[in-house]
Regions:
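Acidic, Ser/Thr/Pro
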Residues: 1-159
């Protein structure tokens, strides 16, 4: 939060700032108890389709409940944006803000990707990550971030 000092401190400011910490999203509540099962199921999957997406392009595909899909960069260093929608209700879509609130700025194995209000449910679960070796670099950067929105051509036109 930016502190601009425009407003006056309330008389009870000390009491307000000394309140006990409230954990909004307890770690034990977000634990994925199904991860072991999902990892076993991954061993049984068969490739049913392959889609190659050229750089600076996009493709849509449908993944049914219970199916797996893999995103793989096999040529160069690419940045890929992922948008998830409920195929039966396009109003329900990936909500990076809630996912970030629950799992932090970067997601990986076991983390769920949540949908928007009023649905707020898991649209996908990450079951494998070939880039988990990367961790965080010296600049604090990592992979699979949910810091902002996906590509938006209007971002660069803001004044």
């Amino acid at each position: 939060m930016k502190i601009n000092k425009f407003s006056k401190k309330p008389l009870d400011a000390i009491d307000r700032t000394n309140k006990d910490l409230v954990i909004s999203y307890p770690v034990d509540k977000k634990k994925n108890n199904n991860l072991k099962i999902l990892l076993e199921e991954r061993k049984k999957i068969d490739l049913i389709n392959e889609i190659i997406i050229p750089p600076r392009d996009a493709k849509c595909f449908t993944v049914k409940a219970g199916q797996f899909f893999r995103i793989e960069c096999f040529e160069g260093s690419q940045v890929g944006d992922l948008n998830l929608f409920n195929a039966d209700n396009l109003n329900e879509k990936f909500y990076s803000g809630k996912t970030r609130a629950l799992y932090g700025t970067h997601i990986s194995v076991g983390d769920k990707m949540f949908s928007s209000f009023p649905y707020l449910r898991s649209l996908a679960i990450i079951t494998w990550d070939t880039l988990d070796w990367y961790g965080y670099d010296k600049d604090g950067g990592s992979v699979h971030d949910v810091i902002g929105t996906r590509c938006d051509p209007y971002t660069y036109k803001l004044t």
